[in-house]
A protein has these predicted regions:
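Mature, soluble, non-transmembrane domains
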Residues: 65-68, 73-81, 85-176, 191, ...
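Beta-rich interaction/scaffold domains
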Residues: 1-2, 16
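Compositionally biased regions
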Residues: 5-6, 241, 340, 376
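Bacterial N-terminal signal peptides that target proteins for export
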Residues: 2-11
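Short, ordered beta-strand-loop transition motifs
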Residues: 11, 175-178
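Bacterial Sec-dependent N-terminal signal peptides
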Residues: 15, 19-35
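Structured domain cores in non-transmembrane regions
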Residues: 30-112, 178-180, 189-357
Length: 433
């Protein structure tokens, strides 16, 4: 009896390590709740492109019968704004009325040819106007109280007369293809009653979002005081201060599309693979249009995929970037994960033809915690011809229809053929908690 009891005790104690091992294995394979958050952390800018211009000859001035050109990209609804000094004046400048020179007809056809009819002469309001001409003394007499900017239409506040801007300056647009234009300024004032040189100047193109320009008055505003270095152009022909200011307003603005989040195990990243063409399972729709629903539905049928979510931002659907003091959009999702699970995400670079952000390689270890923004890359889906991001007539989110191409998926270089992007971690942030 004692022997039997002793054997039973040993059997019980001998089973304890096996029981503990079994419990440990069970604990390791138990589901764990984690939370993923994706944020648009881009400190956005309102201008997609800008620049300065001057004559390339011995003098930076554009004299009568001289011309210069500069190139830019633009989508339908965007406009070209520029300013330069009416040289033989005290504080007058040339500029189109805001928001700028129209670049596309309402049907989307690029506008070409003479657009001089959109040019005007403006008074900066900081100097008393003398009779325009070679004898104007600079800087002249300051206004006792600076006035607001106003159009000079025939005569100025002192009664001096002026020919129409369109007879002094000729503006010509040429469409170069793929949303790119060349604008040429020609000084045609030589044979008029108001001959004048033109100074170096500044030009700008505003982003457009939801049909509205982010900055419809980038260089000046009629009826408002001059600002940001415009006086230096209007009085002295010095474009450096306004050029520097506008450069600081120029950069990247892009929303992110509703985010695709996938949990998978035992397979490679199921969303994409660099070096191969789009698989035709819905990634093209995500990359071109920001629509991840088709890809999510397909992935739910793939062996090894445990869950697929499409996360729209509350109220806005898309994840907007930071705009001034307004925080960027974000989305979150609780996930049930276990040992060996991986997480992959994808979201469209909204103002592109077919670029998308996605986890690189084989995704993220689902049981880790922290900031995984460094695990995100920017990729070209290879299904649409690229244009300047945020200024492409065929970009879907700018009311365009993408132009088809067929190339392997590849990382977007930075700098790229169009612009220099911020670091990816300065655009999208991914956190697991």
């Amino acid at each position: 009896m004692k022997t039997s009891s002793l054997k039973l005790k040993w059997l019980v104690f001998g089973a304890i390590p096996l029981f503990l091992i079994s419990c440990n294995e069970k604990d390791e394979n138990q589901m764990q709740v984690t939370s993923i958050t994706i944020e648009n952390v881009l400190d956005s800018k309102p201008l997609v492109e800008s620049g300065t211009f001057k004559n390339s000859g011995a003098s930076p001035l554009i004299m009568p019968n001289e011309s210069l050109s500069f190139q830019f990209s633009a989508a339908k609804g965007q406009a070209l704004s520029f300013v330069c000094m009416y040289g033989w004046s005290n504080d007058l400048f040339f500029a189109p009325a805001n928001p700028g020179i129209k670049l596309y007809q309402d049907n989307g056809t690029p506008i070409e040819g003479d657009v001089s009819g959109q040019l005007k002469i403006w008074d900066n309001g900081t100097r008393i106007n003398q009779v325009p001409g070679a004898n104007v003394s600079h800087p002249g007499t300051a206004e006792t109280t600076p006035k607001n900017i106003m159009e000079v239409s025939g005569t100025d506040a002192q009664g001096n007369t002026y020919a129409a801007a369109s007879t002094l300056m000729k503006g010509t647009l040429h469409y170069d293809g793929n949303s790119t234009f060349t604008f040429t300024i020609t000084n045609t004032s030589g044979g008029t009653s108001n001959p004048t040189p033109f100074s170096p100047g500044v030009w700008a193109i505003s982003y457009i979002a939801g049909g509205n320009l982010l900055n419809p008055n980038p260089l000046y505003q009629n009826g408002q005081p001059t600002a940001n270095g415009l006086t230096n152009i209007a009085e002295m022909g010095d474009n450096s201060i306004l050029g520097t200011y506008i450069q600081g307003q120029t950069g990247i603005f892009t929303p992110l599309s509703p985010v695709l989040v996938v949990v998978y195990n035992g397979i490679d990243n199921p969303i994409y693979k660099t070096g191969e063409n789009d698989r035709g399972k819905g990634l093209k729709e995500l990359a071109q249009k920001g629509d991840a629903t088709g890809l999510a539905a397909y992935l739910k049928t793939v062996i090894g995929v445990k869950a697929a979510y499409v996360l729209p931002a509350a109220n806005t659907n898309i994840l907007l970037p930071k705009i001034g003091s307004q925080a960027g959009g974000s989305v979150s999702q609780q996930l049930n994960v276990s040992e060996g699970d991986r997480i992959a995400i994808a979201t469209m670079y909204g103002f592109s033809n077919d670029w998308f952000f996605a986890t690189v390689g084989n995704g993220i270890n689902a049981k880790q915690k922290g900031d995984f923004s460094s695990s995100i890359g920017l990729f070209d889906d290879g299904t649409a011809i690229n244009q300047f991001p945020g200024a492409g007539i065929t970009q879907f989110n700018l009311a365009g229809t993408p132009l088809v191409e067929s190339k392997p998926i590849e990382a977007v270089p930075n700098p790229n053929a169009f612009t220099t992007l911020p670091a990816i971690s300065g655009i999208i942030k991914v956190t697991l908690k």
